[in-house]
Structures are given as C-alpha cells and as structure tokens.
Amino acid sequence: DLVVVYKGKLVAAMEFKSQRGPSFGNNFNNRSEEAIGTAHDLWTAFREGAFQNTPRPWLGWVMLLEDCEASRAPVSIEEPHFKVFPEFKGTSYMKRYELLLRRLVLERLYDSAALLVATEKQGKAGQYLEPAKDLQAKPFFASLGGHIGTILAGQS
C-alpha cells in the first residue's frame, strides 16, 4: 500500500493486492470485502475530520491476478435461495475482478482501479497484461496525476 502526504495533508492512498491460485473463490470474497471495508473506513474517517481538513484525497486500488486456467475458467454458481445477477453467470474470477473494480469506481468508493494479470513466468519478468481497457494502469496513474496537479495548483 502507498500513502501520499503533502505538507501534512493526505493527498492519495493506493492499495495494491495480488492473488494467485489455487483457491480463487475464498480469496476473491476476502479481497472484495477488504476493498469495500477499507474504502468505507477511509471515507468515514474523512467525513469525521480525521485528516485535519484535508481536501478530498484520491483513492486507488490495483489488483494483480495470476493468469492461469483456474482464473479464466467459468465459476460454478449455486442459487439455493436467490437468483444471482446475470452478469455473474458463466464468468471467471478474472471477469469477476473486472466487475468488482468497475463497481468500486462506479460507487465512488475508489477514484480509479487497475486490473493487471500475469502468468507466473510473466510476473517474474515484470510483464503483465491488462484484460480490460477501462482498468489499465495508464488511466489509473493519469487520474492520480490529475488529482496531484489539482492539489499543487491550489497551493500557488
């Protein structure tokens, strides 16, 4: 994780998470709950003035997922009591991370999110793929840069 503080004010915070197989199911649920809970805690602290009248900080979330057969395979769904939303039917954990990250931004819990995937070999070489255009690293860091630029412009 990374926190950016400028002149004693919280400017930005980023969470970096990773997941590799084999137990994608449990870990996906844990990562989802953690992302939502962390953001909620930060925004509650911000609302309550814990950051000493800091302008609204920028919050980002980056996920590095192992690109393997298990992360790309459709997940089985049981519906004993209620129907699952259609967008989750027949999806892989990789696709579910896309849906999660988009919703984290849509719900304004995070300002931006990025999904990076890599095989074990790619990861060791520092290489990765970006399966979703709207969740790429470049717009993620451009969003952060824009926020920092706004903070700096307000200092002059």
Short names for language-model regions:
Residues 1-2, 21-24, 43, 61, ...:
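Generic detector of bulky aromatic hydrophobic side chains
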Residues 1-3, 70-90, 134-149:
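Short, Lys/Arg-enriched charge-dense amphipathic segments
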Residues 3-13:
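Active-site beta-strand-loop-beta-strand hairpin of nuclease catalytic cores
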Residues 16-20:
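Short, histidine-centered active-site or binding-site loop motifs used for metal coordination
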Residues 23-121:
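Acidic, metal/cofactor-coordinating or nucleic-acid-engaging core segments within structured domains
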Residues 116-156:
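Charge-rich, low-complexity intrinsically disordered segments
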